[in-house]
């Protein structure tokens, strides 16, 4: 535990300088959207609560709480006909829990325009799709402390150029021992910069001043490198009410990104009979705001549980984001 905390502190100390130098300058922004309606409906304040399959996106340490194989799918409808698809699977094994995750940020077909054809009269189209694939491992280090790690491969693609890299997430949760009070932290998207390469950046330099020389000179435009959206998140969760069939859970997280000012996210979840849920939250990240959602969970048969969830995210300038998710454990 001491080693993990030391790593977290070293990275945290370096983040303020990075944030000032790269304000608004990181790439792979699709990684910031997270996944799973429960966590999103509470404003993304999930780093301490992290007790379900959604933990694979926010704090891998939370996967250690899973006691059965679990599969989850999430569909998000964003602005400009963009879709965000998330899929995750986790199962107890190897003395802990192993998880797999995939994220797809899909633009759909867009009309190709060029300097010569600025209205796209050719009718040609292209896509801008981003993907991330993760492998996670989490385990209970003590009866109070969990730790987890995710390694992921990231690929951003625009037509015939792409930028590929890798990153990892590191997290932990700690049960204080006072009621249901729990603390959590996560460092996400720590990895090398991305840089676009590909066919659309290739050209023939030629010798325009010497037309008599008929020779191709292949060359490439070199794109500028851009950093990952590095994030340090520290949170707390506590059950304000836990009586009979009623439970009210509060969550509060502080965010320290490398490309925005520090902010916070917060949320509440009311659960009845551990089967029906109503959620509300606030996402303090730039241009975001109120969030909300509903959920239900039921036993399909002996040992098989299924959950369906919905979330709504307001946006200051763009259309609201709606997500739907389904998960099953067996």
Task: Label the model's feature ranges.
Residues 51, 67, 82-83, 131:
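Short, basic and Ser/Thr-rich N-terminal targeting/leader segments
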Residues 20-40, 84-330:
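Outer-membrane beta-barrel porins/channels
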Residues 44-47, 69-79:
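Short strand-turn segments of transmembrane beta-barrel domains in outer membranes
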Residues 18-67:
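Outer-membrane beta-barrel biogenesis signature
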Residues 4-15:
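Sec-dependent N-terminal signal peptides
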């Amino acid at each position: 535990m001491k080693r993990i905390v030391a790593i977290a502190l070293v990275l945290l100390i370096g983040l303020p300088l990075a944030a000032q130098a790269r304000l608004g300058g990181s790439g792979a922004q699709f990684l910031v959207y997270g996944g799973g309606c429960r966590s999103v409906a509470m404003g993304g304040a999930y780093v301490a609560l992290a007790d379900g399959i959604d933990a694979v996106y926010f704090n891998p340490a939370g996967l250690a709480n899973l006691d059965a194989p679990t599969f989850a799918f999430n569909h998000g409808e964003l602005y400009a006909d963009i879709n965000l698809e998330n899929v995750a699977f986790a199962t107890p094994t190897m003395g802990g829990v192993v998880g797999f995750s995939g994220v797809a940020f899909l633009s759909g077909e867009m009309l190709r325009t060029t300097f010569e054809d600025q209205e796209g009269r050719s009718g040609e189209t292209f896509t801008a799709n981003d993907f991330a694939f993760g492998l996670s491992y989490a385990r209970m280090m003590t009866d109070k402390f969990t730790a987890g790690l995710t390694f992921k491969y990231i690929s951003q693609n625009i037509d015939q150029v792409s930028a590929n890299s890798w990153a990892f997430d590191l997290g932990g949760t700690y049960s204080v021992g006072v009621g249901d009070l729990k603390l959590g932290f996560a460092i996400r998207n720590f990895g090398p910069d991305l840089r676009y390469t590909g066919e659309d950046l290739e050209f023939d330099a030629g010798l325009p001043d010497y037309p008599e020389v008929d020779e191709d000179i292949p060359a490439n435009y070199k794109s500028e490198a851009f950093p990952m959206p590095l994030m340090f998140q520290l949170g707390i969760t506590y059950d304000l009410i836990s009586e009979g069939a009623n439970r009210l859970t509060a969550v509060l997280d502080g965010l320290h990104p490398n490309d925005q000012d520090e902010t916070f996210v917060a949320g509440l979840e009311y659960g009845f009979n551990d089967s029906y849920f109503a959620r509300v939250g606030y996402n303090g990240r730039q241009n975001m705001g109120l969030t909300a959602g509903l959920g239900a969970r039921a036993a399909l048969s002996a040992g098989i549980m299924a959950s369906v969830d919905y979330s709504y995210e307001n946006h200051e300038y763009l259309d609201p984001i709606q997500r739907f998710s389904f998960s099953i454990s067996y």
